[in-house]
Amino acid sequence: MKNLLICIIKMYRKYISPLKRPSCRFYPTCSQYSLEAIEKYGALKGTLISIKRILKCHPFNKGGYDPVK
């Protein structure tokens, strides 16, 4: 499951992300953050942490440096 999620994120980064203008308010980007979270915590916890981060990525949030802890 972990490898499948990583593959999906990498496909998103390669094929979908270049079609959109950059809009992530954080560093590392939400997709990179998701990759790191899934690698570090596994499929379930990493996905939950990633969803929480993606929900924070909106115009009303200041953003900034937010590494996987």
UniProtKB/Swiss-Prot annotation:
InterPro entries: Membr_insert_effic_factor_YidD. HAMAP family: UPF0161_YidD. It comes from the Bacteria. It comes from Clostridium botulinum (strain Okra / Type B1). Its main location: membrane. This is Putative membrane protein insertion efficiency factor. Could be involved in insertion of integral membrane proteins into the membrane. The keyword Signal does not apply. The keyword Signal does not apply. It is found in: Cell membrane. It is a peripheral membrane protein. GO terms for cellular component: plasma membrane. Disulfide bonds: none annotated. Belongs to the UPF0161 family. PANTHER family: MEMBRANE PROTEIN INSERTION EFFICIENCY FACTOR-RELATED. Keywords: Cell membrane, Membrane.
